[in-house]
Amino acid sequence: MNGTLTLTAAVALGVVWAYHAAAFQADIASVKFQDVAPESGLSFVLHNCPTPQKHMIETMAGGLAVFDYDGDGRPDIFFTNGAELPSLIKTGPQYWNRLYHNEGKMKFRDVTEEAGVAGQGYSMGAAAGDYDNDGHPDLFVAGVNRNILYHNLGNGKFEDVTAKAGIRSGEWAVAAGWFDYDNDGFLDLWVVHYAKWSPAYDRYCGNQTRGIRIYCHPKYFEGLPSTLYHNRGDGTFEDVSTKAGIASFAGRGMSVVSADYDRDGHPDVFVTNDNMPNFLFHNRGNGTFEEVGLSSGVALREDGKAVASMGADFRDYDNDGLPDIAVTALTGETFPLFRNVGKGNFADATYASRIGALSSRHSGWGVGLFDFNNDGWKDLFTANSHVNDRVELFESAVYEEPDSVFVNLGNGTFRDASTGAGLNESKAHRGSAYADLDGDGKIDVVVASLGSSAELWHNISPETNHWISFRLTGTQSNRDGIGTHIRIGNQQNDMISAVSYASSSLDGVHFGLGRTTSIDRIDIVWPSGKHQTLHDIKVDEVVNLREPR
């Protein structure tokens, strides 16, 4: 890192969003990662408690979050963990959720006990966001019949405020995301549920004659709708699912991501569903949503088939200024890539981008669109593994797989750079999170795996390209600036927290700049509608950006 720059910047109200002269050329320079978890102090192992009964929840654990909980400028790492089955009780430290403090220089320290975040129940997903705008990011943990909202006290400790905040439990929640759907300056919470389930559910799936039991197909589970909690601004939340018009849309939800895909100033929501059509909830701007997944072209593949949609990211991969949607799925289904073509419509670009051919033999969970080689084009990382640990007995597929990275060539297509990148660890990968963990200007990756140690992929790609990152402080908007749009040249990136599979990455907004050595102009639009313009900005900096009042 060359330094940190704090700016309040010039304000230009009513600026028209437009492309600027600078364009970024794709650089096929190698992307390279090294797993430094063993020497970093990151010793987390995800204990999902596999049983002979093959409870579905066993194969779906693994969400995590990266966020700077203590405000020291270094992103920390939180992992969700399982529990004993069938009791759903964390009977020992092996089942604790874990928080690791970033000590700097890729070293981490377990602070779970002192922070008070070991948790309860069988945990699934994590979402970080400062819901009370006090400058200390809070944490929501989604789980099976037990959700937890932790309030960050600002002294290295968290308080469980679930009950008094009005957050309910009792259903199987997989993932969640913070976003300000009504732009009132307070983050709201969207919680995704999978299906009706209890430990007493004991359907036998597989080949009973051969004594081979497997996890049941999703079709045997009745899906559930998501829950939307409106932040009242006083530390409490109201369930507005019915009022907002989402309560009637039941699905087997896996992940949630939010972005303003039609640039009308109101954040929209995409929910992946397992072997059901995906949901795209268009924000009408009056407190209600319209489900438009089918009409917009993101509910199904181009051939009209639903896939086992797992994780998702909602960012602009082709630098046309509109956020696109990347999804992971099972082997043989490909990883759908939906290109935003404007006017509320998406085109299936899975095969046109070559992601279809490159991903057809993989099963994916976590996913992220980030510029790993800083050439100005977002690449695609996927955390891979099949859902069924006995799949080799029935199909020509494998259970444990290495992760993948597909490099964006800047012409609408990708190439598989996984082998050369060093992604060679075959595990039952699940959630993934993304952040510049050591401040060197390159995005690193953390991946959780069932029954195995977490991976900490340090980005050691050649430092031939430049970059800039923004840490946002909202004043009229939510404190984290979630939902902010930033444009540099032909690039646009949004401040998004929910990402991947059941995971969260709260680490500002990052841009790769290629060989660009100075930036003439940067345009920012905050969720409040406030426009901001920066001029003549240095590269290779972390910019602390505060919303003007």
Task: Give residue ranges: language-model regions.
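Repeat-based blade/solenoid architectures
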Residues: 42-63, 115-127, 166-177, 221-224, ...
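Hydrophobic beta-strand segments that make up the repeating blades of beta-propeller
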Residues: 74-81, 134-143, 189-193, 268-273, ...
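Beta-propeller blade repeat segments, especially FG-GAP/WD-type strand-to-loop junctions
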Residues: 24-34, 85-111, 146-160, 206-207, ...
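Short consensus segments that form the blades of beta-propeller domains
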Residues: 54-57, 86-92, 215-220, 270-271, ...
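Gly/Ser/Thr/Pro-enriched helix-cap/hinge segments flanking short amphipathic alpha-helices
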Residues: 23-32, 50, 54, 354-357, ...
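Short, conserved, GDST-rich strand-edge loop motifs in beta-rich repeat architectures
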Residues: 80-94, 194-221, 382-399
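Beta-propeller blade termini
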Residues: 61-71, 101, 122-137, 151, ...
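Asp-box/WD-like beta-propeller blade repeats and closely related beta-sheet repeat scaffolds
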Residues: 113-128, 142-181, 191-219, 223-225, ...
